[in-house]
Amino acid sequence: MRVDIISVLPDFFDSPLANGLLRIAREKQRLQLHVHSLREYGLGKYKQVDDTPFGGGAGMVLRVEPVFACIEKLKADRDYDEVIFFTPDGKQFNQSEANRHALDRNLILLCGHYKAIDERIRETLITKEISLGDFVLSGGELPALIFLDSVARLLPGVLHDEESMLTDSFQDGKLDCAHYTRPSEFRGMKVPDVLLSGNHKKIEEWRLENAIERTRQRRPDLLKDINL
């Protein structure tokens, strides 16, 4: 998979891409990441990428010219499955979306900044808009990293234990069960006996029941789509 990230803050990605799972995905050549500075396509002596909004009002708006120039240059070299923009009014991102995008070959992630981006960019260039929730961030860089992490871990060979991925929360429509490790007792808090029993059938039954109960308590909305 190749992902091209467009941002006015390209250095923002240096540390996250050099550590953890994203570093592993790159080293294993499962993920090619290219970060493009939008200011390289800026206008005039000062490489301007934003301007005041028509009609007045607070904040600055990302201009059309730099974004068009960058994306058109990328598209001249290859086809892309999606051009994604992160925005609070986009489609809610979830595990199903991450699973789907793990099958893509080429993606462009446009990170917004300032108050907004010119609507003509959204109408013409953007093929998908994604929201992480009902809140506002200062830019699209953090959402882009969250998107990348959730997708990269699904790529073949990235996770050391791929079976672990199959039992993650949301993979089968419900939350994950509770987990414990050593010691079996700490300050009077004991691990459930069934997990120490060695009876794999009963352990799996406990985990399923625990996951369903946890989902019922914390995310009951998920259960309507599950046949229990």
Swiss-Prot record:
Signal peptide: none annotated. It is found in: Cytoplasm. InterPro entries: Alpha/beta_knot_MTases, tRNA_m1G_MeTrfase_C_sf, tRNA_m1G_MeTrfase_TrmD, tRNA_m1G_MTases_N, tRNA_MeTrfase_TRMD/TRM10. Gene3D superfamilies: 3.40.1280.10, tRNA(m1g37)methyltransferase, domain 2 (1.10.1270.20). S-adenosyl-L-methionine binds at residues 112, 132-137. Disulfide bonds: none annotated. GO terms for biological process: tRNA N1-guanine methylation. Its main location: cytoplasm. Keywords: Cytoplasm, Methyltransferase, S-adenosyl-L-methionine, Transferase, tRNA processing. The keyword Kinase does not apply. It is an enzyme of class 2 (transferase). It catalyses: guanosine(37) in tRNA + S-adenosyl-L-methionine = N(1)-methylguanosine(37) in tRNA + S-adenosyl-L-homocysteine + H(+). SUPFAM superfamilies: alpha/beta knot (SSF75217). GO terms for cellular component: cytosol. It comes from the Bacteria. Belongs to the RNA methyltransferase TrmD family. NCBIfam families: PRK00026.1, trmD. Specifically methylates guanosine-37 in various tRNAs. Homodimer. PANTHER family: TRNA (GUANINE-N(1)-)-METHYLTRANSFERASE. This is tRNA (guanine-N(1)-)-methyltransferase.
